[in-house]
Regions:
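Extreme N-terminal basic, low-complexity initiation segments
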Residues: 2-5
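S-adenosyl-L-methionine
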Residues: 109-157
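Glycine-rich SAM-binding Motif I of class I
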Residues: 75-79
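Rossmann-like AdoMet
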Residues: 12-65, 82-116
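Hydrophobic/aromatic beta-strand patches that form the interior of the parallel beta-sheet core
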Residues: 68, 95-97, 146-148
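Conserved class I S-adenosyl-L-methionine
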Residues: 64-73
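Active-site segment flanking the S-adenosylmethionine/decSAM binding pocket
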Residues: 142-185
Length: 185
């Protein structure tokens, strides 16, 4: 494991470690909360099972879709959605919300592109990770990304999603994100 300290945007220092999950993909572990960013069984496996198989796959090939991710985290779900969009000729407008963005340096230490066998998409991955927050980024002709540095409970835009990736930490560590008011919003 690589031990890295980063300063969160709330000015509280939080330790983060890069770990390997069972499918070989890396993830981030927060010792203070005893919580992983992804399933210990596999970061990539989880993303495909939860967000693609049970979300994006419900839309027909060639569709135009607005995706809202609550918990942008490492950007893995965004990258996998991009890869699926290319494969299925989808037009995606992707909005990612993140209250505590990870440092780009740490994200580039993750092995997601290798594990996805998508090294040819390095430029796209870099663009996803380094695009400015609060601005629309044209990742490709059919994939737009807006990253917003905002807490879930402070996001109040209506009509911005056909599909929501709710990728919050579990209720054990963030019970405030698992309330009825969050889901009504």
């Amino acid at each position: 494991s690589i031990l890295i300290f980063y300063l969160c945007s709330d000015s509280n220092q939080m330790e983060r470690k890069i770990i390997q999950t069972s499918d070989g993909s890396s993830s981030v572990y927060l010792p203070e909360w005893d919580e992983n960013y992804h399933s210990k069984h596999g970061a990539i496996q989880e993303a495909y099972h939860v967000f693609i198989k049970n979300g994006l796959d419900l839309f027909q090939d060639g569709s135009a879709i607005q995706v809202l991710e609550m918990g942008f985290g490492t950007g893995l779900n965004c990258m996998i959605t991009y890869l699926e969009a290319i494969r299925r000729d989808l037009k995606i407008d992707y909005t990612g919300l993140e209250g505590y963005p990870l440092e780009t340096k740490m994200i580039f230490e993750l092995n997601h592109l290798e594990q996805l066998k998508a090294q040819q998409e390095l430029e796209v991955y870099q663009n996803i990770q380094t695009s400015d927050w609060e601005k629309l980024a044209k990742i490709s002709s059919k994939f737009n990304l807006t990253k917003k540095g905002i807490m879930f409970e402070d996001f109040h835009e209506n009509g911005v999603a056909d599909l929501i990736y709710f990728d919050a930490f579990g209720a054990r560590v963030q019970p405030e994100l698992w309330t009825e008011s969050i889901f009504k919003n």
